[in-house]
């Protein structure tokens, strides 16, 4: 068997059928499907079993993914979140590229399931960040993560003591025994419901905070109060307030998107060493700084507008 697809779930009866339908429609792919469920209170387990998936007991994402991996028979483990969508050729192309490039681990570009230009820009920049750092500081979001089974077992799987960023930690450790790269042949479409719950700006700031803490202090464990994370909790929605602010900074972010898209194309072609690529990265960084300044220099109306705080 070429691959084992492992999906950690908690109360995903509404969105899981979309992904299961995509997987059922896969062409030319040999894989098994495993759902690791964290004791859902809805019909998630019934939905999974009806699709032919093997259901095992899960928990937090790292726990669920490890539980699925323990019973997996595939040479390549493909970890997907329950709310993603994949093209019909996803499994075949992903597995083929992993084998052709002899990768130990990989991820793939993300496209948001959203009509907001801002969401597209955010994901374009995130994709570029992963590509630019795939050799020196590997990152991979858990919504799409591929790992050779032998490499996964060798490093002991996901660190279940971590509260967040267990996906980044995993690919960092895997990269010590084999290459990690972003795949070029396929992609996933990802939900923006976490943005909608926490707000785009708040979510971005949380991501920055996590990155800085990991770089300066270390991994964030379950008993840490550095950030909050509630697996499967999407009950709140403050997207309306976020939209008001985002419309005002969108023009600045579009400038950034043009730069990052051009550079991303160069990285894909393997032209990272060209001086022109470095110069373009510098311009993209400058555009990001300008967009950030525009965010805090704007004066949005309405009670949901964020206040600017200064430590000075």
List PLM regions with ranges.
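Short, acidic, metal-binding catalytic loop of nucleotide-sugar glycosyltransferases
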Residues: 21-30
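A conserved acidic beta->alpha catalytic loop
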Residues: 22, 37-45, 84
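Acidic donor-binding/catalytic loop of UDP-sugar-dependent glycosyltransferases
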Residues: 43, 80-96, 172
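Glycine-rich, basic loop-to-helix element that forms the pyrophosphate-binding segment
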Residues: 57-72
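Short aromatic/hydrophobic "clamp" motif used to bind/position activated sugar donors
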Residues: 77
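Conserved donor NDP-sugar-binding/catalytic core segment of glycosyltransferases
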Residues: 89-118
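A recurrent flexible, glycine/aromatic-enriched loop bordering the glycosyltransferase active site
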Residues: 110-117, 128-150
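Acidic donor-binding loop at a coil-to-helix junction in glycosyltransferase catalytic cores
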Residues: 164-170
């Amino acid at each position: 068997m070429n691959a084992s697809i492992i999906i950690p779930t908690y109360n995903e009866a509404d969105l899981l059928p979309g992904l299961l339908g995509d997987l059922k429609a896969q062409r030319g792919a040999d894989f098994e499907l495993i759902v690791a469920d964290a004791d859902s209170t809805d019909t998630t387990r019934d939905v999974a079993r009806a699709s032919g998936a093997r259901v095992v007991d899960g928990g937090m994402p790292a726990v669920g993914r490890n539980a699925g991996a323990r019973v997996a028979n595939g040479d390549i483990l493909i970890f997907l979140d329950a709310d993603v969508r994949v093209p019909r050729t996803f499994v075949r192309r992903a597995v083929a590229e992993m084998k052709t490039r002899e990768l130990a681990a990989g991820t793939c570009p993300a496209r948001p399931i959203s009509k907001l230009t801002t969401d597209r820009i955010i994901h374009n920049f995130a994709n570029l960040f992963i590509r630019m750092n795939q050799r020196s500081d590997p990152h991979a979001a858990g919504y799409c993560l591929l790992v050779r089974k032998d490499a996964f077992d060798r490093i002991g799987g996901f660190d279940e003591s971590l509260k967040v960023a267990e996906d980044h930690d995993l690919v960092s450790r895997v990269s010590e025994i084999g290459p990690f790269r972003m795949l070029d042949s396929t992609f996933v479409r990802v939900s923006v419901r976490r943005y909608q719950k926490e707000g785009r700006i708040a979510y971005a700031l949380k991501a920055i905070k996590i990155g800085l803490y990991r770089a300066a202090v270390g991994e964030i464990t379950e008993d840490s109060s550095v950030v909050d994370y509630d697996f499967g909790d999407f009950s709140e929605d403050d997207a309306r307030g976020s939209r008001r602010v985002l419309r005002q900074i969108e023009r600045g972010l579009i400038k950034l998107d043009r730069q990052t898209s051009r550079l991303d194309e160069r990285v894909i072609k393997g032209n990272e060493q060209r001086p022109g690529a470095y110069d373009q990265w510098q311009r993209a960084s400058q555009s990001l700084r300008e967009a950030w300044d525009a965010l805090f220099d704007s004066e949005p109306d309405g009670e949901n507008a964020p206040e600017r705080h200064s430590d000075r």
